[in-house]
Every structure is written in structure tokens, then in C-alpha cells.
Amino acid sequence: MSNNMQSISNHTKLIKKMRVYFDNNRYEELALFLKESNCINEFHEDVDLQFYYYCLGSCRYYLDKEYKEALHDLQMALEYTYSPNNHYYTNYEILILSCIGKTYFSMGQVQKAFYYLHESLAALSSVSINENTYLLTRIFYNIATTHALNGTYEEAQIYLEKGIQFANQVHNSYYLSELFYEKAIISHLQRNIEVAIEEMYIASGVAKAVDNQELVALTQEKIDLWKE
């Protein structure tokens, strides 16, 4: 195999591995992989560097709670391809906008948080359906859980329902169990106990279907607790 072909093969394997870890929220494995593989030296295209910094920023956010550093990485990721004058957006640009919103909320900057979360939703209308569109279900989860943390439960429920509709539209269960789980949690907070239990059963069923064992255990724990 020529050096050029070998380089392309290595590059493809690196991106594929990163996507598996990232899409399944396996951030500890992703962070270790980014560090040990030194993969940034293999990336030269803007879209690849964007994905690298998106992954890095996500690891800083979810694992290290280093929100300022996470925001820096996410903004750097966005700048590789994003322009506010664009008439269309890529899937990852929309996802990064949403994650920037979440990060601002964690930093206590609520107004900026919802600005970016709503920007990501507004950009959704410019995306054509493709094989990776299902990933965008995450943006509904992000804005809904941010509303829940903000105590605006009715708005949270609206976006959870929209997320469920979107998942059905793209015929993919990515983040579907998480959406139903959050719906159940909010329904329970609103004292709609029977509805909450029903929604948690749905969340559990979807989690089992996609083999999300962590969420299976969590949903069962809630069901047992709420039925007491």
C-alpha cells in the first residue's frame, strides 16, 4: 500500500473510532483516544479539525466540567466552517451551536445560552435529510434539559415532544430513550404520576432496544421507586 493510501486509511479509522465514542456518549474512552492517538496531527481538512475540537470540547464539558475551556474548544470548532451569513448549515455546525448554548448555561450566562440553543433550532430548517440527520435529535434534548434546569418545565416538555417527533420523522431511536426519560422526570415533578410511570416504561423499552444498559437500570430504578 502506498504512503498516501495508508494515510487515508489511518485517517478514516481515526474519524470512525471518534464517531463511535462520541455518538454513544463514551466520553472517557473518547478523551483517552484523543490523547493517546495524537490524532490531531492526522487531520488537515477543516471538517475533520472541527470534529476534533467538538469532541475535545465535549470531553472537557462532560468529564472535567471545565466550562470555559470547553467553550473555547467549541467556538474554535465552529469557526472552521461556520458563517452567520450561511444559508445552509452542516449537522455538526448545528450540534456545536447547541452545545455552546449548554455550556453558556453551565457558566451562568442564561441569555447567551438560550440564544445559541434557539440558533441551533432555527438552523435545522436549512438541513436536508441525510444518513446522519438523526444526530440532530440531540439538540432537542439539549434545549429541553436546559429549560428543565432553568425551571421552565412547560417549555421543556414542548421541546421534548418536538424531539420525539423529530426522531420518529428520521426513523431513528438516537436519544429517544433519553427524551422519554426526561419527559417522565418532568411529569413526575408536575405530580402527573401515572403519566410519568408510563413515559418511564417507554424510555425503558427504547433503552433495552438500543442496549443502553445504564439507562435501562436507571429507568427501572425510577419505576420501582414511583410505584411504591
Describe each PLM feature range:
Residues 21-36, 63-79, 110-121, 152-161, ...:
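Helix-turn-helix repeat elements of alpha-solenoid scaffolds
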Residues 12, 51, 88, 95, ...:
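Residue register of alpha-helical TPR repeats
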Residues 34-42, 75-86, 118-129, 161-172, ...:
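Amphipathic alpha-helical segments of tetratricopeptide repeats
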Residues 17, 56-57, 100, 143, ...:
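Structural register within alpha-helical repeat arrays
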Residues 21, 60-61, 97, 104, ...:
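Residue at a conserved register position within TPR or TPR-like alpha-solenoid repeats
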